[in-house]
Amino acid sequence: MFDKNMTIAGYDDALADAMNAEAQRQEDHIELIASENYTSPRVMEAQGSVLTNKYAEGYPNKRYYGGCEHVDVVEQLAIDRAKELFGADYANVQPHSGSQANAPVYMALLEPGDTVLGMSLAHGGHLTHGSHVSFSGKMYNAVQYGLNPETGVIDYDEVERLAKEHKPKMIIAGFSAYSQVVDWQKFREIADAVGAYLMVDMAHVAGLVAAGEYPNPVQIADVTTTTTHKTLRGPRSGLILAKSNPEIEKKLNSAIFPGAQGGPLMHVIAAKAVAFKEAMEPEFKTYAKQVKVNAKAMADVFMARGFDVVSKGTENHLFLVSFIEQGLTGKLVDAALGEAHITINKNSVPNDPMSPFVTSGIRVGTAASTTRGFTEEDSKNLASWMCDVIDSCQQASESWDEKVVADVREKVKALCAARPVYK
């Protein structure tokens, strides 16, 4: 029998110390990793609930285990809200992550060895879009498209040419590091011309889509996948959506369970249900709009300071900065900004001469900073401070100006104190 007042603190001090230190880091550092965000206390409440105890293999009202009458309600709430939020006819809320949403789509629609056409990782795609180190590149014949070198936007002519040449069974639209608006309809036309399925991975922009700040692909694609964190601000998990197609829906359900997963995580599904409800609130639309405003403001500062912003700006929550001209590595810039308590991630950029472990660029995102209340002016100031730190970096000695970094760190400290994550 458990005492409800039991805590980790006082029982496992090493773990408690690490958790408390991370909580403090999140308050004291500015989070600009594009795939991260802060969830609400309600989402965390669901994830820490007794639902974690319940096994529920199968689907609502079609379980292999008994005692599922209450978790059936939870999962159906999540399904119904996901469909309403994104205008979908079908939703599967069981995937544990974005990658585990993508993999079952491959399983449902393809056979091993089939050809898929996806965005190159080096140009902004995701590992699961055909990278040779991923299941998507190992089990399937992956062909990759990229960006137009002159415009920095998706080269739709190349997509069409590769589709006609290789006749893929599935085309993947979506990205992990692309700052412009994807023309979903253009991808649909290309897919139809070669008889391919169209899968859209909207993991990064799902929150913007939900708020009407980015085009909705759900009724255009055959299948749409997403994570539920990032701009959607829910738990770290996955989701599959689709327009009406009973045959595909049946295949997708079977590919998730029993194909790719066993029992769903009911506490996480409850957290998704909460997040979907939060995303329907008027405040969320205001948030999503501000995310874009802040990203544009930051990208403009970087360009004004002479840095190469890939695609020459942003129309969503993120942008890439290339330091090829400056001869700096993303690894060095990442470390320098980290010392200033600004968290970003190094990222490969088009025509990057460095390895993925080093890179020549960084990815900057405003989903988390906007959640904690950063304004457009805050974002401009922050970008300027970042540029100061980057300007002080010396690649030859792999160092930076400690005084500049210390000055920025103090400014970051003051801004974080004024904009707490959890009050």
UniProtKB/Swiss-Prot annotation:
UniProt binding sites for (6S)-5,6,7,8-tetrahydrofolate: 121, 125-127, 355-357
Keyword presence, Cytoplasm: yes
Catalytic activity, EC: 2.1.2.1
Compartment(s) of residence: Cytoplasm
Enzyme class: transferase
Site residues (Plays an important role in substrate specificity), renumbered to this chain: 229
SUPFAM superfamilies: PLP-dependent transferases (SSF53383)
Biological process annotations from GO: glycine biosynthetic process from serine; tetrahydrofolate interconversion
Catalytic activity: (6R)-5,10-methylene-5,6,7,8-tetrahydrofolate + glycine + H2O = (6S)-5,6,7,8-tetrahydrofolate + L-serine
Annotated function: Catalyzes the reversible interconversion of serine and glycine with tetrahydrofolate (THF) serving as the one-carbon carrier. This reaction serves as the major source of one-carbon groups required for the biosynthesis of purines, thymidylate, methionine, and other important biomolecules. Also exhibits THF-independent aldolase activity toward beta-hydroxyamino acids, producing glycine and aldehydes, via a retro-aldol mechanism.
Family annotation (HAMAP family): SHMT
Descriptive protein name: Serine hydroxymethyltransferase
Organism placement in taxonomy: Bacteria, Pseudomonadati, Pseudomonadota, Gammaproteobacteria, Thiotrichales
Gene from which this protein is expressed: glyA
